[in-house]
A protein has these predicted regions:
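Short gly/ser/thr-rich secondary-structure transition/capping motifs
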Residues: 173-185, 228-233
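Short, surface-exposed, charge-dense and proline/glycine-enriched linear segments
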Residues: 58, 86-95, 127, 160-174, ...
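C-terminal functional extensions of proteins
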Residues: 275-278, 296-299, 307-309
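Terminal amphipathic alpha-helical/low-complexity segments used for targeting or macromolecular assembly
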Residues: 1-175, 300-309
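Left-handed beta-helix
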Residues: 181, 186-187, 192-193, 198-207, ...
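Residue-level signal for pocket-adjacent positions within structured domains
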Residues: 137-139, 156, 178-180, 218, ...
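Regulatory activation segment
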Residues: 232-240
Length: 309
């Protein structure tokens, strides 16, 4: 069989499969947001958030105003087009079709207006990473080299769009960061200031997770939901845990369930599995085969329990 016959045969088989196998086709539907365009926009947004760090050429203070204006203008047009596609695919309740273009413009402007606030909280994440990792040489190294910073920056951007009920785009953004960093931060998660995940790889933060300020986690931590038969029926419910302020969670710990609260100032040891709430200032560890929950105040004169890895 020559190449022409092979292509013809495969074309017929694939087209037949499109009719036979549904659910993974998107034919005759709305024009979906472009994954390639969104990843390019996300990179440009990182350039705005961290000027001089994600650029190929030096950025000079004498030119920063003009360069920022030009980059904002470019992002505005591209992002507005992708948001319009997302609204056409999944319009918010009560939004008539004729107002989608205007709504996309307004949402894009509102999103961009939040960038200064996002920068302020990202600065606290950089500080948390630098102060929380003795291996960090400088803040420059943290921003340039640590995959966590890119992942949390993208999550905080995507969260703004998630709050505005923009479909598809927030998840495309965070899954791109997931692919690059190895850390899965859902755009719906509420994450406080001074957040740091050391080593990053394998950490999962689910959609309805709530994380307070000054929380530090390590690789392989999972803030996850219970796997229940109800499935999609649980979509609007709180399914993931709440982590209060100044909690440290060591590598491999799994914390599960929407009613689970880890109290302020607690330390969660490595590889523990938690499905129940923990009181503030607790230490949760394995003692042999048994998990123990201890009061950290009772151990204040004993060995240090917060380690660096």
């Amino acid at each position: 069989m020559d190449s022409v016959e092979t292509v013809t045969k495969l074309t017929n088989e694939l087209v037949a499969s499109y009719a036979r196998v549904g659910g993974i086709n998107h034919l005759d539907g709305k024009n979906l947001p472009s994954k390639r365009a969104i990843t390019a926009i996300t990179m440009d947004l990182l350039r705005l958030l961290f000027p001089g760090y994600f650029d190929e050429q030096p950025v000079h203070s004498s030119e920063i105003r003009a360069e920022t204006a030009a980059l904002l203008d470019a992002i505005l047009g591209k992002l507005e087009d992708e948001i319009r596609k997302a609204l056409e695919y999944s319009p918010p309740d009560g939004l008539p079709k004729k107002k989608i273009t205007a709504a996309a413009h307004s949402l894009t402007l509102e999103f961009l207006e939040n960038l200064p606030r996002v920068r302020e909280i990202l600065q606290t994440d950089v500080e948390a990473a630098f102060n929380g990792d003795p291996a960090a040489i400088s803040r420059e190294e943290v921003i340039v080299a640590y995959p966590f910073i890119e992942a949390i920056a993208v999550q905080r951007l995507a969260h703004e769009l998630y709050l505005k009920n923009v479909a598809l785009i927030p998840r495309i953004m965070t899954e791109w960061a997931h692919f690059r960093s190895g850390m899965d931060l859902h755009p719906g998660a509420q994450i406080g200031s001074h957040f740091f995940v050391d080593h990053c790889t394998g950490t999962v933060v689910g959609e309805t997770s709530i994380i307070g300020d000054h929380v530090k986690m390590y690789q392989g931590v999972g803030l996850v939901a219970k796997s229940l038969a109800a499935g999609q029926a649980l979509r609007a419910q709180k399914r993931h845990p709440t982590i209060e302020d100044r909690v440290t969670i060591y590598a491999g710990a799994t914390i599960m369930g929407g009613e689970t609260v880890i109290g302020e100032g607690s330390t969660i040891g490595g590889n523990v599995f938690i499905m129940d709430s923990v009181a503030p200032h607790s230490l949760v560890i394995y003692d042999g085969l048994d998990m123990r929950v201890l009061n950290k105040a009772d151990r204040k004169n004993k060995a240090v329990v917060d380690f660096q890895i």
